[in-house]
Amino acid sequence: MHGNGGQPAAGGSESALSREGQPGPSGAAQGQVISNERSPRRYSTRTINGVQATNKFTAVGNPSLQRDPDWYRWNYNHSIAVWLRECSRSHAKICNCGQFRKHWFQECAGLEDRSTQASLEEAILRPLRVQGKRAKRKLDYHYSQPTPNRKKVYKTVRWQDELADREADFTPSEEDGGTTSSDFDGDINFDIGGDSGIVDELLGRPFTTPAPVRIV
């Protein structure tokens, strides 16, 4: 800061960017004219070599940008202005309400209740889940392949384990007579000879006296 006669204020130091002739946000380079205009909307406007630059968008909530030499470049505002213009044009094609900014606030946009959007969310998220499952299958395949330090990992068949668990949990009841398959002898001969008559009956041949099943 400067006091009377252009001298630095007592007890302070003068920054290089604030000296006249040095380019930067706090001073003007030679041949440049800077005009500060305070807007009623609390953002400043500067004109440098006929180019108007403001901090309307970049300075909101971030005063530290004022210390950046590139803070007054018009690219910031130009990019945001182009984006807002595209938002307005896209909104005009799909909606008839007055302003597209209403869609930024749920209480003003008249959005549907989330319960009615469940099917829409499912339609959006389903491709992501399918792609995730597909990627997992690919990873499982590569994981099962042998490596120099690991043997091949075989897929576990779960239905065999579940069947063994059900058999282990089985307990005989009174309806079963309190017996299990292990209570029966394993020496029953189920061999049915050709002369037993049962085969003839199944084939529609004349019925003959069936021979009894032999139990050894």
From Swiss-Prot:
**Molecular-function GO term, any one:** protein serine/threonine phosphatase activity
Reactions listed under catalytic activity? O-phospho-L-tyrosyl-[protein] + H2O = L-tyrosyl-[protein] + phosphate; O-phospho-L-seryl-[protein] + H2O = L-seryl-[protein] + phosphate; O-phospho-L-threonyl-[protein] + H2O = L-threonyl-[protein] + phosphate
Low complexity composition bias: which ranges?
A: 21-32, 178-187
Annotated region (Disordered), positions in chain: 1-50, 165-187
Answer yes or no on keyword Zinc.
no
* Keyword field contains Hydrolase: yes
Q: Which UniProt keywords apply?
A: Early protein, Hydrolase, Protein phosphatase
Root EC class: hydrolase
Q: What induces it?
A: VP1 and VP2 are detected 12 hours post infection, while VP3 only after 24 hours.
Q: Which domain of life is it from?
A: Viruses
Q: Which residues form the active site?
A: 95 (phosphocysteine intermediate)
**What's the EC number here?**
3.1.3.16, 3.1.3.48
The record's comment on protein family reads: Belongs to the gyrovirus protein VP2 family.
**Functional summary from the UniProt entry:** May act as a scaffold protein in virion assembly. May also play a role in intracellular signaling during viral replication.
Q: Which protein is depicted?
A: Dual specificity protein phosphatase VP2
Q: Which source organism?
A: Chicken anemia virus (isolate USA 26p4)
- Output the lineage of the source organism: Viruses, Viruses incertae sedis, Anelloviridae, Gyrovirus, Gyrovirus chickenanemia
Name of the gene encoding the protein in the UniProt record: VP2
